[in-house]
């Protein structure tokens, strides 16, 4: 049975639904933009029966597909899980609210589908991928510092507009919700504005405007570091590193330390590190606006990055390690890492004589005990030994992080495994093993699209070696 409620404005689904994503904010006058009521069959046709090949995001139980309408235009279609939005009237009312929003930094919501227990949203399609892909799965070109500053500013503008329009909360704000339009400019996905508030969320405070500020802080940490950091670990990244250690190694010598310090301080405030008071959206916009010194920063570089990656997307045969990671065969991965030993570390870490003197025998014994436990598949002991080694050394072999990462995977702790894969990448930025292990951890976390992208990047790095 179809939904019994309809919005006041509907448009024939075959008409052109492309809207100007660069339009200025709506003023008080004029008519509200219409929302199209799509049939389930129309969306099914647009996505080729919701083919996995058309999935562009599966970060949560809600999946986003790329669809093509009868007029040839592309759209993004979000499919909610069957447990969401049980009240169709509430769903339509909220879709109507979001559909009225128009801002040059916000992706337009253009339609919906409410068919039985099925719920869908339809938005303009952004052709140049997400910030997450630009930062975490980059292959050839590092995102310029000036572009990162513009991304932060544009997202802050979008959040401030939404807050002013009465949308104080945003569902799981992250680098995956920041999209790039055809001009290479950053826009915030409108899908995150659709939140079904239940009594449990109200009680726990999970729907809280301050959550948006915190999550924006994690995006700032992403932009500084170039790394995928779970939101719960973002304060730890700020706490353990100064701005020099946090910065993306690919940006070395290519950024302003004064500007980076401003972003670092703002991220600390958003994450409430050391009890700092969180800024509001207008204060965030004002701070980031002062950093927009390169208004001519070429957004087309983002478009060029996309084109380069499409040219390089033809995957070659995977190595034995790549095949094992694709199969998520932990036993085979273990055998390969044991056989490799520390060979890959030789070109990365060369201890000076003074460092060798400081490397006391007891600490080396701790690592050897960890290695012995790792070989014998006593992974809890390996984790304990490697953790002690990591805590007492300023410079850690990337293979230690790799071995602890795999140990965490065996112990069913994929989030910690992902962090260690990132730590290994931080020491050795172009090490395929670090990316391979991250791909397995991402798959364990049900982040399948990101896992596939990371696996592909590892394979490309392996070819370049």
From Swiss-Prot:
The keyword Plastid does not apply. Residues 1-12 have a biased composition (Polar residues). SUPFAM superfamilies: Protein kinase-like (PK-like) (SSF56112), TPR-like (SSF48452). It holds the Pfam family PK_Tyr_Ser-Thr. Its main location: membrane. GO terms for molecular function: ATP binding; protein serine/threonine kinase activity. Residues 50-291 form the Protein kinase domain. Interacts with YDA. Belongs to the protein kinase superfamily. Ser/Thr protein kinase family. This is Probable inactive receptor-like kinase BSK12. It comes from Arabidopsis thaliana (Mouse-ear cress).
